Amino acid sequence: MRDIPNSALILGLAGLVPFFWGVATSYDPVLHNLSLTWLSERYTGSSVNLIYGTIILAFMSGVLWGFSANVSDKRRPIGLILSVLPALWAFFTFNGPFINPFISLIVGFLGVFAIDVRFYYWQLTPKWWLTLRSILTFCLLYTSPSPRDRIRS
């Protein structure tokens, strides 16, 4: 963890705040009601995790695209194809009738991590990348929404 640049670690951890907010507003009745009153249902409970999770999957597609675009050998086309999969996964599965969006989110994060591992072994990422992504992915899975909010209004 010492090799991760401070800015990358701080910003990565800051990106987890909405996920922890989703968990907090799922379990704490006071935060739940405050969030409903001052924000909206979209920023409360598992809704925030699903919405923000979709954004993160698309964001990670862009990051992976950038890694792939920097090489000029046979890894580039495969990397570019792999890099768009998380965004396409989010688009086609989150609102479809075939898979629960909560399960889709978890599968999407695991898929991104698998691509991260592949890119790391292809040496497309910085040396510290997989350590950071391991920490963030663990936290994402830990805060993954359940199909039911814990608190009912």
Where are these regions (language model features)?
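Short juxtamembrane and helix-loop transition motifs at transmembrane-helix boundaries
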Residues: 40-45, 61-73, 123-124
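Alpha-helical transmembrane segments and their membrane-interface exit regions
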Residues: 108-118
